[in-house]
């Protein structure tokens, strides 16, 4: 039996978000729908989820002592990481002391580091992956590239949004690629992964829910990446029945091996009927924002339902849908959005995240659309995103 208290009362059920960006904001809103008390934590003030939380705190989430202090102050029943850059060793300690980390501290630690999740997938679970080598010095990095061959990709083992990544075509790029990887890691200079290039037809995110009533799958989400970040996503991505079956089997093995209840974003390469594991996030995925319009239960609603111990039952997908990011480039601490009236309409929505500032290029919103076909949905979403004029 799941017992939920009422927010701001003595018996409240408390959820602490570690990371309060646009994904955390939607998780907070879903918690609010169930009367759950929300505490939003991030490294900067006025982060999106803080706008819809009961309380908020600004800390360095890589500082384990600071993390412990805020947890001891708020006494959450659930700790919900939204990002990778967290003191995961402290999360493991807190979990050992009886706190509930979503989906579990081990999953958060393994997926924070590309080495942890790659070794789990390729070596323990024997899943198909790209060829790879790990290196912690420039000389070993050069040896790894020689072993993998050209072209290849180098990434810091701890980074996100394409930071520190280089597509290497020749030996002339090696020195610069190593230096860039050292600058782009979340925890500073360190270890890298060198990966062989996988030939694939498309990439998908298979949003996979591990819940009290079993493992559930959303329809596959296709997406287009640019500079390491997604630009558009769509659902459903068409693929063969055999490829879908293989994708679901890989995703099932990964989420059960990681453990815990919640939604996982399992990233896969698809080539014909073949499916290759890429990465996994133990939390809602940015490409999954399309589910805000494409499903009866968004990825955020599914995540909350799962980690609270509630059954999912089933997931209804409404048909072709797409998302397109609103990604301006400017510098401002007083952003405004003009021409919004032309970005909404029948089966056409936007979400503006409420980020407090921008300095360069930053994702500030997303357009969402449905249509008779995926192609039309993508075009509608892209057009709507382009209608929003960001000023500051």
UniProtKB/Swiss-Prot annotation:
Keywords from the UniProt entry: ATP-binding, Ligase, Magnesium, Metal-binding, Nucleotide-binding, Purine biosynthesis
Binding locations of Mg(2+): 267, 279
Coiled coil: none
Signal sequence, start to end: none
Family: Belongs to the PurK/PurT family.
Function: Involved in the de novo purine biosynthesis. Catalyzes the transfer of formate to 5-phospho-ribosyl-glycinamide (GAR), producing 5-phospho-ribosyl-N-formylglycinamide (FGAR). Formate is provided by PurU via hydrolysis of 10-formyl-tetrahydrofolate.
MF term (GO), any: ATP binding
Name assigned to this protein: Formate-dependent phosphoribosylglycinamide formyltransferase
Binding site for ATP: 114, 155, 160-165, 195-198, 203
Catalytic activity of the protein: N(1)-(5-phospho-beta-D-ribosyl)glycinamide + formate + ATP = N(2)-formyl-N(1)-(5-phospho-beta-D-ribosyl)glycinamide + ADP + phosphate + H(+)
Domain ATP-grasp: 119-308
Keyword Membrane annotated: no
Subunit-structure text: Homodimer.
The UniProt record lists the keyword Nucleotide-binding: yes
GO cellular component: cytosol
Superkingdom to which the source organism belongs: Bacteria
Sites where the protein binds N(1)-(5-phospho-beta-D-ribosyl)glycinamide: 22-23, 82, 286, 355, 362-363
GO biological process: 'de novo' IMP biosynthetic process
Pathway listed: Purine metabolism; IMP biosynthesis via de novo pathway; N(2)-formyl-N(1)-(5-phospho-D-ribosyl)glycinamide from N(1)-(5-phospho-D-ribosyl)glycinamide (formate route): step 1/1
